[in-house]
């Protein structure tokens, strides 16, 4: 199920979007160690159920102010891969901003998690607006790494991560221009400043 009334693909200020996805996966994993490794070749069969729910909505508070919110929850019954790195690359991700969709951050990945945030927006004109986005992310069971680079589940609800972004957006008929600054709780001192021009087009993934 997927529905949307948003007025923009990248920086909406009106409408809502909602998606409920249920998927069943069956596959085969092959692992080939590098030269000099004492680990042998490995082949595993995997099957799991994955459920996810996402919703974002925007509310007009006044002539200039809009308050949006975002929620995503995911549950996957998948087993661990051969090592920690492979496990994290296959784990579900919380990426509510355009910048986070383009980066790989292990701190915001888990097989089961809940993430939510608010999006206060101040409309300067029909073309320009100031936008704040502030999110919290909590894995139900965080994925940890032992001394052998194997994955295991940590204590339930023992980790919390956050990210925030402030941007100035110009919306044009052919795309958007955005100047932004953002911060992630992990890695430490993770600050980014950038300029985005045009549209970022993401196709549907085989594993959502």
Where is each model-derived feature located?
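Generic structural signal for short, solvent-exposed loop/turn connectors between secondary structure elements
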Residues: 124-126, 173-175, 187
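C-terminal outer-membrane beta-barrel translocator/porin domains of Gram-negative envelope proteins
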Residues: 1-125, 129-133, 142, 151-154, ...
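Short strand-loop junctions, especially beta-strand C-caps/beta-turns
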Residues: 23-25, 180-184
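Short, surface-exposed, polar/charged, turn-prone segments marking secondary-structure boundaries
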Residues: 96-100, 146, 205-208
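C-terminal structured domain segments
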Residues: 153-182
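Outer-membrane beta-barrel "beta-signal"
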Residues: 166-175, 190-208
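C-terminal/domain-terminus segments
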Residues: 129-150, 182-203
